[in-house]
Amino acid sequence: MPTVLITGGSRGIGAAMVRRFYAAGWNVAFSYWQSEQAAQALATQMPGVLSVRADVADSAQVAAMFSAVYAVFPHIDMLVNNAAVVQDGLFLDLTEADWQRVFAVNFFGAVYCTGEAIRDMYPRGRGNILNISSIWGLKGASCESGYASSKAALIGLSRSLAKEWGPSGIRVNCIAPGVIDTDMNAQHSAETMQALAEEIPLGRIGRAEEVASLALYLASPEAEYITGQVFSVDGGWNIT
């Protein structure tokens, strides 16, 4: 069976991907950082799923995480860089520490994980990397300059890696979700969520399972000729 490693897999879109890949018969490993209770509950529901605590912003912890995965599964066939933090605020209010943290997790975490994964994929001549960006990485957003910039950087990374590693059989793609019904958006009021839904051509908020379904498709043989692409899962919001 193929193996997938999903970072930030204990909640939201990450947890939906853990469930979807597990249901499709994959070996599944996922990382978490603060959500230990949620991670344990998720792993308990699916025998054989491996959960590993790691801060992806720390390259040493990333290396240890990959070692823990390889101790159970011989190879990683697909890496999903999903771990992320949100950093809201006016541009002039963001501190140096704010900028460093949002890029450390959202961008450099993906860099560290991708480096570890490619070292395993390259000798085998195949592999699949999926980066989870955001609609804000495509459109930008007021009071989201830190988060949006880090997610835009993921898009540039994905396209560059697709060109660099395509000749070695490694595919790299990106998903840019819109407003999805997850804990990350639970901070918004019902009125705010309704207002957002009204801006979306399909007229509703997205579901984490819809993002997970696309991730699984991009891992499938049917998607073997797809690389370097950014897929919006946003109900058409990106075209408004």
Predicted regions and their residues:
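Conserved glycine-rich cofactor-binding loop
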Residues: 10-11
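Conserved glycine-rich Rossmann-like NAD(P)H-binding loop of the short-chain dehydrogenase/reductase
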Residues: 24-40
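Alpha-helical segment proximal to the catalytic Tyr-Lys
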Residues: 119, 163-167, 224
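Substrate-binding pocket helix/loop in short-chain dehydrogenase/reductase
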Residues: 90-91, 98-103, 185, 192, ...
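Short C-terminal tail/terminal secondary-structure segment
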Residues: 139, 216, 227-240
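Residue(s) in the substrate-gating loop at a strand-loop-helix junction
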Residues: 134
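Active-site helix of classical SDR
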Residues: 114, 150, 158
